[in-house]
Amino acid sequence: MIEIKHLRTLQALKNNGSLSAAAIQLHQTQSAISHQFNELEKKLGFKLFIRKSNPIKFTAQGEILLQLSKEILPKIHKAIQNCKKTHQMIIKLAIECHSCIQWLTPALKIFQKKWPRVEIDFYSDMIFSPQPSLQQGKLDIVLTSEVLPRSNLFYFPIFDFEVRLVLSPNHPLAQKKHNILPEDLISEILMIYPVKRDKLDIWKFFLQPAGIIPIFKNVNNTLLLIQMVAAKMGITALPHWVVDTFEKQGLVVTKKLGDGIWKRLYAAIRDGDQKELIIKNFIYAIRLHVCTHLKFIRDTQKPHFFKNVKNI
């Protein structure tokens, strides 16, 4: 019975004090405003204001509806603004790959140029466990090399990378002709990120199976890690692409671990979210960037996943 336009007209009448002034504000004729009130009062069965009063004086019923307009109209305005923001999506992202930030930052900038309404909230895996948080809906995407079985998560492959031993050019192991063996590291200081040991590829796939336990030293920054290696303060294991620039400068050298440790980086999402347009485009953007710009990786393109993805 009472429409939004009636509440707006009541408020305009209150603010302007006359039908003629209210009509100007609402871009209507005075007769149209008067007709609107007559029809509404007829439906309601009571008067809303006293005619020919100057300034306009509202009846008790009119005051009640006027108060309603003050409460309702701001809420309607806010709701409309929220509706307009539906295109402004937030992607909650976490990484379990410390060194990935090196290529992720420029990839995010490229994505946001194409999708300026999409906000990226970045979370650190140092604070919580990303994949359980993804399962609980607290995150949207996790970049990880660990696949959890029976997790109801979908793992989209981004690229394959080799984990290599990184050491100073003056380190004795740098001169060895053969690939590095587990026993070569038995007395070495192995500098690692401050994570659980079973998350370290060199431990899980190389040292632990051979029963070799070197001296571990925590370092929480990739650049510092490489600088310490260059200064012969220890050795480390990193994806080959991470140290490419430093190796070219002669600051460090890399060696293959055994027959080679190859890992795959995934974008983990909740199963079903692979159909979401924004999620698909985000993964497409970072994969396209990294496979175009990073060296020493293998492309793992999965074309059917990108069907109907916006051309970015």
From Swiss-Prot:
GO MF term set: DNA-binding transcription factor activity; transcription cis-regulatory region binding
Disulfide bonds: none
Subcellular location: Cytoplasm
Residue ranges of domain HTH lysR-type in the record: 1-59
Pfam name, any one: HTH_1
BP GO annotations: methionine biosynthetic process
Gene3D superfamilies attached to this UniProt entry: Periplasmic binding protein-like II, Winged helix-like DNA-binding domain superfamily/Winged helix DNA-binding domain
Alphabetized UniProt keyword annotations: Activator, Amino-acid biosynthesis, Cytoplasm, DNA-binding, Methionine biosynthesis, Repressor, Transcription, Transcription regulation
GO cellular component entries: cytoplasm
PROSITE patterns documented for this protein: HTH_LYSR
DNA-binding region coordinates: 19-38
Family named by the database record: Belongs to the LysR transcriptional regulatory family.
Protein name: HTH-type transcriptional regulator MetR
Species lineage: Bacteria, Pseudomonadati, Pseudomonadota, Gammaproteobacteria, Enterobacterales
Gene responsible for this protein: metR
